[in-house]
Amino acid sequence: MNRPGFPRFSVLIASLCGITLLSGCVAPTAKPNDPYYAPVLPRTPMSAASNNGAIYQAGFEQNLYGDRKAFRVGDIITITLSERMAASKAATSAMSKDSTNSIGLTSLFGSGLTTNNPIGGNDLSLSAGYNGARTTKGDGKAAQSNSLTGSVTVTVADVLPNGILSVRGEKWMTLNTGDELVRIAGLVRADDIATDNTVSSTRIADARITYSGTGAFADTSQPGWFDRFFLSPLFPF
């Protein structure tokens, strides 16, 4: 039974499967209102005892010699972004293989094969030979340079027992062509915070900095699925 539409259907299914695999290689798009980067509210203090007539009352103390730097959960701190990174990588590989094989048979069941050919020509001789050569060369290069400047104001999410501040937050900007976001999380030492309540991003330990976006501008910087196929490990050549 002939089914002329089956090969075309198979090609369609294979194409859809390939597109699905390639789409899985694309980095997921960040979405707003991520609960991990939501502002952390200060812990509710315990209710103070009623006024007992003393001059000093708990809950009304003020630090006369301190500053306004963040040091508690829920405090706000501004992070100054000053990130510059450049990386390059090159790889070259070359492989070659040559092989030669020969088989000669001059006798069969004890009888020589170099007798006269009854139909004329050369003597009978069973022999075979094989010569092969294979060469593979590859060359790949990659270079990347990034720069990120600006500022993001985040909140203190936790205070570790040694006084280190765990901070995280994000900034969303809606532009004409889409949304731009900057997310940052990490650990800040209180001594690195300046008097104006700012800290450089280079002083953040275990920093997680994300700069991404959505919309037409972000889409133009992404290669199409056909280009990703030729740059993926699925490409056989």
Swiss-Prot record:
<comment type="subunit">
    <text>The basal body constitutes a major portion of the flagellar organelle and consists of four rings (L,P,S, and M) mounted on a central rod.</text>
</comment>
<keyword id="KW-0564">Palmitate</keyword>
<keyword id="KW-0998">Cell outer membrane</keyword>
<feature type="lipid moiety-binding region" description="S-diacylglycerol cysteine">
    <location>
        <position position="25"/>
    </location>
</feature>
<dbReference type="InterPro" id="IPR000527">
    <property type="entry name" value="Flag_Lring"/>
</dbReference>
<feature type="lipid moiety-binding region" description="N-palmitoyl cysteine">
    <location>
        <position position="25"/>
    </location>
</feature>
<comment type="similarity">
    <text>Belongs to the FlgH family.</text>
</comment>
<comment type="function">
    <text>Assembles around the rod to form the L-ring and probably protects the motor/basal body from shearing forces during rotation.</text>
</comment>
<protein>
    <recommendedName>
        <fullName>Flagellar L-ring protein</fullName>
    </recommendedName>
</protein>
<keyword id="KW-0975">Bacterial flagellum</keyword>
<dbReference type="GO" id="GO:0009279">
    <property type="term" value="C:cell outer membrane"/>
</dbReference>
<dbReference type="Pfam" id="PF02107">
    <property type="entry name" value="FlgH"/>
</dbReference>
<feature type="signal peptide">
    <location>
        <begin position="1"/>
        <end position="24"/>
    </location>
</feature>
<dbReference type="GO" id="GO:0009427">
    <property type="term" value="C:bacterial-type flagellum basal body, distal rod, L ring"/>
</dbReference>
<dbReference type="GO" id="GO:0071973">
    <property type="term" value="P:bacterial-type flagellum-dependent cell motility"/>
</dbReference>
<dbReference type="GO" id="GO:0003774">
    <property type="term" value="F:cytoskeletal motor activity"/>
</dbReference>
<keyword id="KW-0732">Signal</keyword>
<keyword id="KW-0472">Membrane</keyword>
<keyword id="KW-0449">Lipoprotein</keyword>
